[in-house]
């Protein structure tokens, strides 16, 4: 059984080799290394650093279901379910009803997971100060690169905490939840954001676009700059964010994957579209026993496939989302399968089983439509899913840059609309022309370019038809993100950050007294709740309030 310790690694290999022949971060098993040993050689320092990278993976030996399914739980719930395009039954259905409470296990585990990583980073950074420059092959430059990666990891986890919970306790170098169990929340969100920016800016300054030693899976300049830009966007400093994103676009190594449908595929690791991912590799053993040798595994298929065909708790997709695509937008066929359609990777027909034929299924009447981003084979074959968790793609960089252009240049920004056009050209298949699909790809590539409807004209009419009141560019970005990032890691956060959450829900999922069919007879989401702006942040976990003497119920986020 693996142990979890600040100076210990818990996996046999975090990243291995891909078809391009590039190297990946390789993490071997090591025994506990005490600080007095850790900082006697560069190899030992890197072993300690690799222990920080371990915090991005699930904890297969954890006592909590959420620890074992990290990167699916709680991520899908936090970043998707409240927007209602993705829906859940069972214990997670409360997110679809906007009825979550502070004692929800997901909040507790998310908080603990993040602070476990931050505590490791703080201890590592405090000890790194004492390391002699002479032990590093590149001298001070080498030491700075180690510090940059550790600070970026800490900055990432504080970003994760801030976007979910707002103001949080800011533990600094040397502080952990063991030696600093009671610390109040930051005085302001700006204090939290500025700390994150400091960490990520330092990382961007000292790291390159290509990961250190060519080990894909390590923090890069592009990853640090992308999350730094997002933090500036939360601060409404779109000028600073825009400059960072423009630098990434002009100088970074990133490109859009020509076919949208080839992103979420077995063995697609660190393509040029990937800015930050957690790679789940195609190990020789992906059977039930795989969790005895690595944490680098997840149940992507089992946790998203239709229950009709072996899924444990399907990732249901709303009827509204399924109807929301323009003709020709291939993201629809690449992302979901609906009632009456054939799952393209398994040949299974949705709704072919007696009792599962309806628009809604199960005791909670969930929509009979499903995401296929992680459902690329029959449930159980293999048990674990060798598809990466793409936390940040280049497509997000482009759309974030578009948002900053509109915010700083106005609604007619040609640069902003050009980024949206690029995303839509890929969505309609124009980047597929002249290329061959990967092996066993169940869709045909476009053979000639087609004319994509002008985004500004389309969304001008869409805005009127749906009843939006925000600027056309805001509506365009919202719906493009909706279609681009279904069941990924950003949509609800983007809605909240851009102040579009209420408007999106009112226009796409209006309250309807719990009806399952609209006035046109189409199946729809039964929405009864009223929008509460307090729900744009999640609650400080009940356990934290009970155990942290510096935080009381009076410090809880409003509305909880």
Regions found by a protein language model. Give the residues of each.
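C-terminal substrate/ligand-recognition segments
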Residues: 342-425
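An aromatic- and glycine-enriched ligand-binding surface/loop that stacks and positions planar moieties
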Residues: 21-91, 168, 193, 201-202, ...
